[in-house]
A protein has these predicted regions:
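Conserved, single-site charged/polar hotspot
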Residues: 1-152
Length: 152
């Protein structure tokens, strides 16, 4: 479905190179790996290996769309759940395989909230403040190299 919307950024591994071509129907995902992140830490390139082929998904928007199956529920920090029918809330996440005794049976996507992955994370700033860091320390963390001064 996403290939039809943006085929130049949904690529198939063929003879050692990625190219734009229709995606074959597959029944099993064998691996998911984030291979590139943007400056803010958002997933920017993702490789999905399946029983029928390997695919590279480029851009945080495409990644959020491809990984959102429309039925999986998102568990928020407060424990509440919400349905995400079309798009994951953010590309700021890690992926961890879920195992039974021996086999991978699924993947957990552990995210960093709603956002675009640039600037200051509200959750991050809040947690830093709860750990005792001051406003200047928090701002310097998120905006490295900036100088904080009084306006005159």
């Amino acid at each position: 479905k996403r290939y039809e919307a943006n085929g130049k950024l949904i690529l198939t591994l063929k003879d050692g190179d990625y190219c734009s071509q229709d995606i074959k129907t597959f029944s099993k995902v064998t691996d998911i790996t984030i291979i590139k992140r943007g400056p803010g830490g958002v997933a920017d390139e993702l490789v999905i290996a399946t029983d029928k082929g390997t695919y590279k998904i480029i851009s945080e928007y495409n990644i959020r769309a491809v990984l959102c199956d429309g039925v999986t529920r998102v568990v928020r920090q407060d424990g509440s759940e919400v349905s995400m029918p079309n798009l994951l809330p953010s590309a700021f996440f890690v992926i961890e395989p879920s195992h039974d005794k021996k086999n991978v049976v699924g993947y957990n996507i552990i995210g960093g909230g709603f956002g675009h992955g640039v600037g200051m994370s509200q959750n991050g700033a809040k947690n830093m403040a709860l750990q005792g860091l001051g406003a200047e320390q928090i701002l310097n963390f998120f905006y490295e190299g900036c100088e904080i001064c009084s306006e005159q």
